């Protein structure tokens, strides 16, 4: 399970180093293989360990090729999907189209989301956090059926 936000850098070759604490689980459980694709709701990237991505692919396979919305979803997620492998230094290469989609520059945030990571431009991440806090503060959580029993 992946959790926490890590500030990392994009090097001049378009690579990022995965934080050390995640490398061993990625190597042991997923052979260092990661699939990167776009987030369809935010300008960030999603990084899935290979076995988690295979679950997504199984769901995508069940979607219709004749329904416009379902086909569009498949086209975006699979069209941008790019499999990478951790190198000996724990780095992965982010392809240029994916970097452009998420407006990634030198300073990046890698954010654990349990079964995957989100990859954000640092400034976009800070804006996203502000938006999330505003949303949570403006809503009555008890009125949300899924959050009614949630407590910290």
Swiss-Prot record:
Lineage top rank: taxon: Bacteria
Keywords for this protein: Cytoplasm, DNA-binding, Repeat, Transcription, Transcription regulation
Xref: CDD domains: MraZ_C, MraZ_N
UniProt keyword Repeat, yes or no: yes
SpoVT-AbrB domain sequence ranges: 5-52, 81-124
GO biological process: negative regulation of DNA-templated transcription initiation
GO function terms (MF aspect): DNA-binding transcription factor activity; transcription cis-regulatory region binding
One protein family per Pfam: MraZ
Any one GO CC term of the record: nucleoid
Record text on subunit structure and interactions: Forms oligomers.
Family from the record: Belongs to the MraZ family.
Name of the molecule in the record: Transcriptional regulator MraZ
């Amino acid at each position: 399970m992946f959790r926490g936000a890590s500030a990392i850098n994009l090097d001049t070759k378009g690579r990022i180093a995965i934080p050390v604490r995640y490398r061993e689980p990625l190597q042991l459980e997923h052979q260092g293989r990661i699939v990167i694709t776009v987030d369809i709701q935010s300008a960030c990237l999603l990084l899935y360990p290979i076995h988690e991505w295979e679950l997504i692919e199984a769901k995508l396979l069940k979607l219709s090729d004749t329904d416009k919305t379902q086909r569009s979803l498949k086209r975006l997620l699979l069209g941008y999907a790019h499999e990478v492998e951790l190198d000996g230094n724990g780095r992965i290469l982010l392809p240029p189209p994916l970097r452009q989609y998420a407006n990634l520059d030198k300073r990046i945030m890698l954010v654990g989301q349990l079964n995957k990571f989100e990859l954000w431009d640092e400034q976009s991440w800070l804006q996203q956090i502000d938006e999330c806090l505003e949303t949570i503060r403006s809503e009555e959580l008890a009125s949300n059926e899924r959050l009614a029993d949630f407590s910290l």
